[in-house]
Regions:
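Short, glycine/charge-rich beta-strand/loop segments that flank catalytic centers
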Residues: 45-46, 80-84, 109, 120-124
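A short small-residue
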Residues: 40-48, 88, 176-180
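Short phosphate-binding/catalytic loops that engage adenosine nucleotides
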Residues: 3, 74, 174-175, 255
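Flexible, low-complexity segments
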Residues: 61-79, 235-258
Length: 258
């Protein structure tokens, strides 16, 4: 059996989430060297209203907790991250250094928030299949964002359009429709331009071949080539997350959660 480390996306954040991370002073010192004094209030409730802070907190926390597992002798043979979680996954795999990840994630958060400062986001729909949900989405400015499970799907778009589709979904038998704590329409074509800008930032950065399998949450494929991983990291904000397929792919490779 192989050990799999997974890293969450936005929605997993909470105030003071960096207060109890392992080896806190050392990792925050590394973050401070890149980000400056911003680190001191990064996980405050006010800061977490912004995409940049949320994504940086998830990166820092993900790396800290994974490194703690490694210190205890638990080393992954495979890593995978959902959305922003792909960045700590790449760091732990050895494909991307932590300092570069901090700079890239800060830019990623800024680009996403600047593109859609308000009025857009994500909504989770539970209890309907993709086929049934897509039929309800017709004529509404919404997109499939995350295919997390057979009947757990996230849509992206304008708040009003998502609310309309959510109501239709509930009327059609969905068990739940929940607006997520994400303020940008991630994982759809609305973020094509910010993703292209982020890709340019990777142009002058040399990633390295990972030391363990890097499983893309977007394509559900294991990537080994540094350029493919760079493309995955840069563009995943504009690509549908195929998390269910990724976890099936991990299972087929005999990988299990640590």
């Amino acid at each position: 059996m192989k050990i799999l480390f997974t890293f969450p996306g936005q929605g997993a954040q909470r105030p003071n989430m960096l207060a109890a991370i392992p080896d806190r002073e050392a990792i925050l010192s590394q973050a401070r060297a890149v980000l400056g004094d911003e680190v001191e209030t990064l996980d405050s409730a006010d800061a977490l209203k912004h995409t940049r802070a949320v994504q940086l907190c998830l990166l820092i926390a993900g790396v800290a907790w994974a490194r703690e597992l490694q210190r205890q002798g638990v080393n992954p043979q495979m890593v995978s991250g959902l959305s922003i979680g792909a960045f700590p996954a790449a760091v732990i795999a050895g494909a991307l250094d932590f300092a570069s990840a901090l700079r890239l994630v800060a830019l990623r958060g800024d680009l996403m928030e600047q593109a859609y400062p308000e009025g857009y986001g994500l909504t989770a729909i539970m209890g309907l299949t993709r086929q049934r949900l897509e039929a309800l989405m017709q004529g509404h400015e919404v997109y499939l964002a995350n295919l997390n499970a057979e009947t757990q799907i996230v849509i992206a778009g304008r708040d009003e359009a998502m609310a309309e589709v959510a109501q239709l979904a509930l009327q059609a038998g969905a068990s739940k429709a929940q607006r997520l704590a994400v303020s940008v329409p991630s994982h759809c074509a609305l973020l094509d331009k910010p993703a292209a800008t982020l890709a340019k930032a990777f142009a002058n950065l040399a990633l390295t071949r990972p030391q363990c399998a890097y499983l893309s949450g977007s394509t559900a494929r294991v990537l080994w080539e540094p350029q493919q991983i760079a493309d995955d990291l840069a563009m995943n904000m504009a690509r549908t997350v195929h998390w269910q397929e990724a976890m099936v792919a991990a299972d087929e490779r005999d990988a299990r959660l640590a």
